[in-house]
């Protein structure tokens, strides 16, 4: 199996070179655990060089190999890769990131994403972020958005110094931007399964009629865009409103970076939730979408988030 995988990766390198003309020396493989491959093997394709930077596209080779094993033709995989590279080139991302030096132009584009602080520790060394347990709230700038797909870049510590801004001030702007870029929504599983047009339920505005489940089943929280929607629980006023609607403190179960289950803490134990989360991660959460296997709680009296379960044995 390993030899088949290695042969596939080598074939990918050759296929990309032949389809795009990108020199082989600009295509490199990095094993999981490297700085640019924290959650999975990646093929790094340098497709454009500038005076002060390279533009690089990272391909998750294990996912591509799985698709190949499941019957996807190799030619189709190469076509999808070249289409993505062409789309990225046309987006002119490098030029659009140059505004990053101007804080006033960058400010409306700032937003927050969640990452696992341990798995991404190498890449977070000079990033701007805050932590809660093993969750990192990371500062990003939106570069482009095409057909619902957002291209973004992390803000590095050096930019705060160049802007002359404190971390707390910039974070406050980014959290607020994140709310308006993709407002929070409650999603009903039965609606998601049977109604393709379902867009979730608003619960933050006066007049919203959204009743939360107060039993052990819990409520699925995400955002209108769903992608990276687990951040919703940390957006302004959201935790307070959830606690008000539940009339209770609540536990948070982050099934992926895209959503978080909200559970009334009167009817379920965190240890039981952690067992369910462990199974969900193993059976349904792609490696690159993993956030945490720990359970968190919101206290409505203190307005604080805390971690209430220890690390799993395989994380220590």
Model-derived segments and their meaning:
Residues 1, 5, 159-163, 231, ...:
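Generic alpha-helical structural element
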Residues 1-36, 41-43:
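N-terminal alpha-helical "arm" segments
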Residues 4-12, 73, 77, 166, ...:
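Short amphipathic alpha-helical segments
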Residues 12-21, 81, 85, 89, ...:
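Hydrophobic, Leu/Ile/Phe/Ala-enriched alpha-helical segments that form helix-helix packing faces
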Residues 20, 24, 93, 182-186, ...:
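Residue-level signal for secondary-structure boundary elements
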Residues 27, 212, 296-298:
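Assembly/interface hotspot detector across virion components, adhesins/toxins, and nucleic-acid enzymes
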Residues 29-220:
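Charged, alpha-helical interface segments at or near domain boundaries
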Residues 224-316:
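C-terminal structured domains
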């Amino acid at each position: 199996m390993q030899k088949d995988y290695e042969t596939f990766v080598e074939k990918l390198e050759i296929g990309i070179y032949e389809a795009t003309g990108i020199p082989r020396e600009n295509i490199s493989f990095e094993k999981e655990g490297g700085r640019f491959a924290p959650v999975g093997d990646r093929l790094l394709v340098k497709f454009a060089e500038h005076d002060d930077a390279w533009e690089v596209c990272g391909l998750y080779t294990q996912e591509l190999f799985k698709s190949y094993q499941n019957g996807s033709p190799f030619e189709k995989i190469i076509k999808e890769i070249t289409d993505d590279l062409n789309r990225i080139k046309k987006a002119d991302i490098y030029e659009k990131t140059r505004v990053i030096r101007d804080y006033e132009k960058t400010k409306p584009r700032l937003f927050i994403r969640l990452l696992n602080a341990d798995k991404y520790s190498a890449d977070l060394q000079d990033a701007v972020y805050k932590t809660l347990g093993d969750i990192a709230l990371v500062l990003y700038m939106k570069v482009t958005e095409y057909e619902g797909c957002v291209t973004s870049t992390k803000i590095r510590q050096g930019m705060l110094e160049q802007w002359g801004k404190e971390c707390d001030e910039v974070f406050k702007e980014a959290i607020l931007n994140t709310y308006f870029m993709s407002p929070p929504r409650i999603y009903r599983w039965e609606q998601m399964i049977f109604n393709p047009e379902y867009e979730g339920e608003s619960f933050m505005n006066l007049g919203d009629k959204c009743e939360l489940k107060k039993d052990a089943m819990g409520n699925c929280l995400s955002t209108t865009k769903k992608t990276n929607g687990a951040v919703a629980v940390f957006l302004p006023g959201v935790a307070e409103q959830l606690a008000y609607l539940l009339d209770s403190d609540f536990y948070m179960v982050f099934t992926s970076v895209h959503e978080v289950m909200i559970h009334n803490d009167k009817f379920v134990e965190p240890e039981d939730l952690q067992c369910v989360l462990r199974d969900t991660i193993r059976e349904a959460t792609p490696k690159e979408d993993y956030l945490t296997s720990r359970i968190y709680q919101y206290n409505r009296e203190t307005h604080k988030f805390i971690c209430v379960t220890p690390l799993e044995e395989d994380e220590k």
